[in-house]
Structures are given as structure tokens and as C-alpha cells.
């Protein structure tokens, strides 16, 4: 076995056998000598030495039964009746393909994906193998692009399909990643939900046949996240094998898991085939989004930590990826649409007095001829409402940013809310350009929340958004943008329109975030409707959910952490009774849950907060700022889950292992009963730790015996600091 070009010692090639190695993972496949097909040999713990190759099966004298083998890139029409990774409608109308191995290329580092978000790294971080396939009958070629991040136990794959023939074809289905795992009992874990209850984990047995999920909303959606985990039934948070797959894409997607008749399990992630049908004329190429695949032999927690580190280090491009985030106050749940210059200056002064560092003006600030005083009008008219802001934004923003923050040498920062991808029919923009809204022929345009979707596949729409955002951000001292989206895509001119939209959207994001690198951008889609790796490429944080109830947020944020780092989560203290659930919870619980997010803030009107709670907020802000660096960059350990325990617990360990913060909660009262111990994980068993100043205690004691706390009421919470001696 030889190392080609010395590429990070991560990619080994021996003839037509390929081995991709991470620190604790190996991904192996080979070319079948008889068929030229790629066959998967292993995806799991690291292996050394010769990799045994399974021969083509022999069944009653028939050889090469393709539905009985592990295939690396299964096409359609040649006897593999399982889910294909590729389906091409050829010029003649059929969907048969015959892609065979041609050659390979090795690359230092990792190439960009044209027009798509993608992981990145230098040649010290990542190595790339490109496997070239060709269909000799249609002259269609496929490049399978594998990038290995050894320190993260991650394999990243995308696919490029090129029509080198003379007739047009159509790509009907294309998966970014597909893998066949050997026969064994497995379970699949996914994140399901809806508006205000995103990212609830669902774990179920992989049965014979096909099971899956996806989104046809045009976006990744509240309903299902583009993430999949596979694990053995015995796998826990800390023990056992787990495979994680995360699609770096914001559009409609499909994930399928199929256990075939022979017991092999195939996982396929990629475009949703109902919204593709991508035409390829001769010479044209379609490139899939990439999919990140990680392997862990330390349970689901190990899988999550690999994804978290990779996304923080090699996906999020923003300078704020691991930078401390300013504590913010957002006006939405405090004022809703009832904002003007007077109310914003008032709330700014009250925020600064509490120690808030950033004031965000949410919806309701724009619209001239069609004022944005409700959700019925104004979207698309991105100029300040002259009745509410008679002097424009700049004088008000100057006054706000001149305010000194209490207990700080800093001035208050200012941020603003926008929803650039949408338009109200009651707007000057729609009156001038109704053709800019997505539509399907003469069919009526379905409104949701009184709004339509602009067609970001159109160059003129892209330029409109880039230009007005450039003007807005240049008009005043704006340090933060909350970019929202509040409906899905219904009518489109063709199935391909949703991916064309994505390409236009990514172009807009890339242009604006490159043009304004000092702005902190936050993604939002009615909460977590676009909480996906594609958004994280450009926006380092996302509003996790419109549900700000502390108890619900424990489920939502811990569910989201299966795939996404806490650094990406926006979480706020809101007023009680909560506006979504009607529940009343203590301020301490609301604050402690919000501190588990990378972007901590408040979502209320300070003038409506009781004097008792207002007196506590500065202390809680100080605690949040102490916690924030560890939450942003530390390794996260889910010690107990809210679905399984009345006492959910989460732990973060700083990168240098010197600091630990524990979040511990009680959901229901515990009457006349002993309390469980919470056992920490990931500590140095031989080291000594101080726990909130007490001790020291050994790491072994803290992990094996644990800590015990009691709560007097339901909705109890505690934040505990440990320091390594």
C-alpha cells in the first residue's frame, strides 16, 4: 500500500483500492475488476494492513448481483433495486446509467464548490481524492470528490455530473453521499419538529425496507433537519459506534435509509428528487452540495463533538465564529410592530443601564407608501418609515451608539432586522415588479403571512437585494443584522427552480458577508426553519426557535446540538408568561438555558420587567459573559437528556481543559425523594478540580461519584464552574 504524493498520510491508494483515514476512522472502497463499479469495503473504526475485498456474490450460477453488494455510488437501471444515488433521464427517455471507474486525482487541501457553501482548509488540515467515473454509452461523467479532515474523523463528499455527450439529459435524482453498511441491527436518529418546536430528536429502528424524511418547502425547514445519525441499539451518549451525516445545504432535501433484502443498510442524502429535474445540455455540469460524514466509537456525544469542531473551525467563515458575542436585547417580543424613534431610544437607554451591549431593532421600521405597521404590508420597501423615523435611521443610531453600557467601557451597539427574500403584495416593490415574485404560469400566487417569495434565481433580484443592503449598512453604524424568512416556497416555474433559488441566495450571502465582514450576521427563518450547515457558512449564529420558553428550549437546543455547535445557537431571556406557551418560569431558569447558546440575549421590554427581576439581570449578564467563551469554543457533553430524565444536564470543557461549566436543570418537583448524582465526563481523572471554589476534587471522583444538588421547586437550575488545578 503506497502513499500518493504524501498527502497528509490520510489517503492511501493501492492500484484500484482506496483508503481514507482519520485519526480514529477509515473509509475504504475498491473498483470491482469485472464491472468497473465502486464497491464499499469499510466505514468505521480505523483499520491497518490489507483490506479484505468481498468477491462478487454467486447466486445459483448468476454472478455480480448488484443488489446484494455494497456499492459506493449506486446508479439506476442495472439490477440494483435499492435507492439510487443518481438517476439520469437520458435523451431517449430511459433512466439507465452505467458509470464505470476511469481514474483518480489527488489534491492538496480542498477545492471550493462553485456557488455552494462548503467546508474549507489548508493542505495541513485536509486532503482530497477525486474519483472519475464515465458512462461509455452516454458519455456522462461523474466526479466523486472526497475530502478527509483527519483530526475530525470526517469524510466530506460531493458529486459533479457532466454531460459530455451530444444530447441534453436531465438529472432526476442526485445524492451528495451514499454508503452501504454491512448487515447488523441499526437505529436511525433524526431531528423533527415544526414552527416553535424544532429539532426534537427521534430515534427508531431501521427496518427492512425504506424509511426516510426530507423537505419540499424549498428550504431545510422546521419539519426535518438535513441531519442523520445511525447507531447500534446499545449506543448511548458516551459509548458505542455512531455515524453522523450532515448535508451542507439550505434547500429542499431528502434522506433515505434502506435495509435491503440481504440486510445491508444504505444511507442516501442529497437533493429532493421532487424538486430537481435539472437539465444538462452538452458541456454542462451539476455539482451537488457536500455532505459531511463522521464516525465515532464514543457514542453520539463523540459524533456531535466531531461535527461541532469541524463546523467551528472549517465551515463558518465569519470572524465571529469563535469570538465572544455581545449580549443583546431584541425588540420583537417587547414591542412587536409598535416601534418608532422614541421607543427605540427609550429601550436603548434601559438596555444600556442593564449591561446589554447590543440593541436590535426588529420588524416594523420600514415602508414609506406602504408602512410596515403589521405583517400585511411593506416587505420589499427597505426605507425607514418617515412617520416613525422622521430623521431617518442615522441620527437615532448615532444617539443609541453614544450610550455608555453600565459596568463597561463600551458603547451600545446597534443591530437591525431584515427579510430581504420576501415581498408583500401591498408594497411599492411589488407594484413595480410583480414578475420578481415566484410563480407558476397563470396559477394564483399563494400568500403566506401576507407575503410572496422573490425569485432569487433572477440576477436583477440578486442585485436589488445586494444594493439595498449595501445602502442600508452604509447609512448608519449597524453592527448586526438579523436576516429572517417567514414562509416556504409554493409555486415555482419548474422543479429546478428551488435549487436555482439556492444558488442565487448563496451568491447574495457571499457577496454581502464578504463586503461587510465586521457585521455580525444572524440567520433566522421563523426561528429554526433554516438551521443548517449551508447557512452557517455565512452566518455564524442562527435564531434557534421562535419558542423562547425555557423548558421547550432545553429540548430544542439539546436536540440541535446533535449536529450543531452551541456557538451557532441564539437564545434569549423572554418575558413571562411566555408568549408561545403561556408558561411562567423563574428568571434564573430562563437565563441559564439561554446561556447554553453562543449568542445570549433578552427578548422583552425592560420597562415591563419587575423591579426585583430587573435588579438580577446585571448579575445574570455578568455570568453569561463568563460562560460565553467556554460555550463558544469548548467541547459539549450531554450528560442527561430531557427526553429521558427529569434532570437534564450539559457540560462544556474549554479547549485547554482548564475550565468546565455545568448546566443542570430540574423540570418537575421532586417531593420527598433523594436526588440523583450528575456524573461529569471528559475530565482528567488524575487532575484536581475546584467546584465553585470548593474542593479540590479529583477528576476520577467527579466522573465516577459525581455531584449532587437539590432544588426546592420545579424549574430549578444551576450553573457550576470547575477549574483545573
Swiss-Prot record:
GO terms for biological process: polysaccharide catabolic process. Gene3D superfamilies: Aldolase class I (3.20.20.70), alpha-galactosidase from lactobacil brevis (2.70.98.60), Golgi alpha-mannosidase II (2.60.40.1180). Transmembrane segments: none annotated. Keywords: Carbohydrate metabolism, Glycoprotein, Glycosidase, Hydrolase, Magnesium, NAD, Polysaccharide degradation, Secreted. It is found in: Secreted. Glycans are attached at residues 407, 490, 672. It catalyses: Hydrolysis of terminal, non-reducing alpha-D-galactose residues in alpha-D-galactosides, including galactose oligosaccharides, galactomannans and galactolipids. One of its GO terms (molecular function) is alpha-galactosidase activity. Homotetramer. This is Probable alpha-galactosidase G.
